[in-house]
Structure formats: structure tokens, C-alpha cells
Amino acid sequence: MQTIYLVGGAAIDITGKPENVCRERDSNLGKVQIRVGGVAHNIAKRLAALEYDVELVSAIGSGFHAGMVRESCQKANVSLQHTLACAEHTGTYIGVYDEDGDMLVGISDMSVLDNLTPDYLSSILPQINASALCVIDGNLTPASLDYL
């Protein structure tokens, strides 16, 4: 079976939802969840669950959060052979929701993906071109999106 390549984000998603009406500019009691996410990561896990061979091309840091991404992918049978380990922190998304679950604000720091440069992507382009399918998420730089 040919491999499906996913190029883009693998991140840590941190979400919070208050128990009651959210009070702005104040601390609110509620629930906070931390889990592995990112567009490309999430799609890769779903495809692997359908028993496709999946390769995630991303960039992650070297700390605790990177370990969470690696463990998530390993458990899901998602290959990280072409994922870069970088000095920066792993991409992070923070979402704050209201008591009904509607988003109040989201902040995304996916700057680690700046390491997926056209030069790096050119080194794995033969594998990508030979794949059954390549899915690219919109978190890459414009230059990398144009290259692919």
C-alpha cells in the first residue's frame, strides 16, 4: 500500500471552559484540557485508524510537548520519519470557550512550522510525489505552500 503524506501542524491544544458565565479580565473556575492536535496530525490519526500507511511531515520542539506528539503518533501508527525536531517549542493552540462551548478567543503559535522550508521539503519531494496522496494544511509559510 502506498503511503499518504500529511504536511503541516502537529501541536498541543489547550482548551478552557468556565463552569459558569465567563467573567472577562478575571480568573474563572472551569475545566482545562490538554491534548495533541494540529490539522495534519488530526487527519493523519484518522487515516491511520482506517489502516492507511501514513507519514506526518511536521516540525516539533524537543521538550515535553514534543514527547506528547511523538507518543500520540506512535500509538496511532503514524510515522514521523520526516518530522523535524527543532530547538523551538512545539506548536501550541489555546482556546477559551464560554459556558455554552462557543469560542471566545483562540491563540495559535505554530511558528515552529517555519522550519518546513522549501529547501527541506525539496529533500523529501521524491517521496511525496510517489505517495498515494498528499494533504497539506494551511499552517505552512506562503513560500512552502507555493513550493508544494
Locations of regions flagged by a protein language model:
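Ribokinase/PfkB-type carbohydrate-kinase core domain
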Residues: 1-10, 71-85, 95-148
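Glycine-rich phosphate/adenosyl-contacting loop at the front of the ribokinase-like
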Residues: 1-59, 64-68, 74-78
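A general structural signal for well-ordered alpha-helical segments in protein cores
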Residues: 40-44, 66, 91, 104, ...
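Short, basic and Ser/Thr-rich N-terminal targeting/leader segments
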Residues: 50, 88-91
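Short beta->alpha linker loops
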Residues: 60-61, 89, 140
